[in-house]
Amino acid sequence: STMTPFPHYQYTESFAKERDALDPLADFRSRFHFPKINGKDALYFCGNSLGLQPKTAASYLEKELAAWATMGVDGYFHGEDPWYSVRKKSKPILAQILGALPEEVVAMNYLSVNLHLLMVSFYQPTPTRFKIIVEGGAFPSDQYMLETQIKFHGLDPNDVLVELLPRTGEFTLRTEDIVEEIRKQGSSLAMVNMAGIQYYTGQLFDIQAITQAAHEVGAVAGFDLAHAAGNAPLHLHDWDVDFATW
């Protein structure tokens, strides 16, 4: 999908403030702590690395620390929010955000750990089907993970990874170019492993089209949704995505 630009777009401070005033989510700004620079709230554009702290975060942490202090190990099964049941309570919430069924999601571990676990299950290279398509400039942790998993199978990342780059003079990938590369790799392609949103350019990929193209050549499609979950509409179940983490 493409966004229609404002017909009267202006590169001016007054126009930016006008759009901010009309933003239905503008009030959410007041719910976060901002670092101060020269006594003023910083203009914060590092959410892709570490988001701003919600003002409610400290109270939630204090609540659980108090439960730990007063109940110790009994906190797993007793109290207002027993820790053991947290994962079950989170399932329907996560499922709604991801467009998945509750039985298809679980809250566990850390992003890179989950990527490794998913690769162990879904990356099963053969002598003829072993290639992995990834967007060029992927998040560094994802690159390290892929190289580690490829070497685990005794393969050379230079022989396995197919990095997608924008056309000359462009900054984002065209969906038709991604699909074309998938079809080009064909029976040698084992997996498409991409982000949902490219952390550096902010490009939202067409997950459905990419997944469909991968399946058409017999490959699996998985996505790192660290920057997409809760940030863009997702319908992972309907799109038939093989695996994802965030």
What are these language model-derived features?
Residues 2-246:
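Pyridoxal 5′-phosphate
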